[in-house]
């Protein structure tokens, strides 16, 4: 697989479109960090790391509105890819839907949102947009 992050986002997107409650994805440290950010920002209900085999899996419980069954995630968009990396400095940090969404950035200090990276004044690779 050439782009495991794109595969992870696609699995989440497909589960959302199929109205699944839980999706299971192969684990990696970067996927764990992205999942943690999605949980902290309220885009997913819960997550659990399951140690099975050499890699393990991440079980992600998707978050839906209880009244009209609308998902908390409207769009997951991969920005940087292995063939064309997209980097940004802290002064040029992207604003997703005028601050309503988040950009997930991989920095030298770890994976964080665009707002956290701007506060720390560090740039990095723009992994994806979530809104």
Swiss-Prot record:
Part of the 30S ribosomal subunit. Contacts proteins S5 and S12. Keywords: Ribonucleoprotein, Ribosomal protein, RNA-binding, rRNA-binding. Signal peptide: none annotated. HAMAP family: Ribosomal_uS8_B (MF_01302_B). NCBIfam families: PRK00136.1. InterPro entries: Ribosomal_uS8, Ribosomal_uS8_CS, Ribosomal_uS8_sf. One of the primary rRNA binding proteins, it binds directly to 16S rRNA central domain where it helps coordinate assembly of the platform of the 30S subunit. Belongs to the universal ribosomal protein uS8 family. The gene is rpsH. Transmembrane segments: none annotated. One of its GO terms (molecular function) is structural constituent of ribosome. GO terms for biological process: translation. GO terms for cellular component: ribonucleoprotein complex; ribosome. This is Small ribosomal subunit protein uS8.
């Amino acid at each position: 697989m050439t782009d495991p992050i794109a595969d992870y986002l696609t699995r989440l997107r497909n589960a959302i479109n199929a109205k699944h409650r839980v999706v299971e994805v192969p684990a990696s440290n970067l996927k764990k960090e992205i999942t943690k950010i999605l949980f902290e920002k309220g885009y997913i209900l819960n997550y659990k790391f399951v140690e099975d085999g050499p890699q393990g899996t991440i079980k992600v419980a998707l978050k839906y509105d209880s009244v009209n069954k609308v998902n908390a995630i409207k769009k997951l968009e991969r920005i940087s890819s292995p063939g064309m990396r997209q980097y940004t400095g802290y002064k040029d940090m992207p604003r997703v839907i005028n601050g309503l969404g988040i950009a997930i950035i991989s920095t030298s200090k770890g994976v964080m949102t665009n707002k956290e990276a701007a506060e720390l004044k560090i740039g990095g690779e723009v992994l994806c947009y979530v809104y």
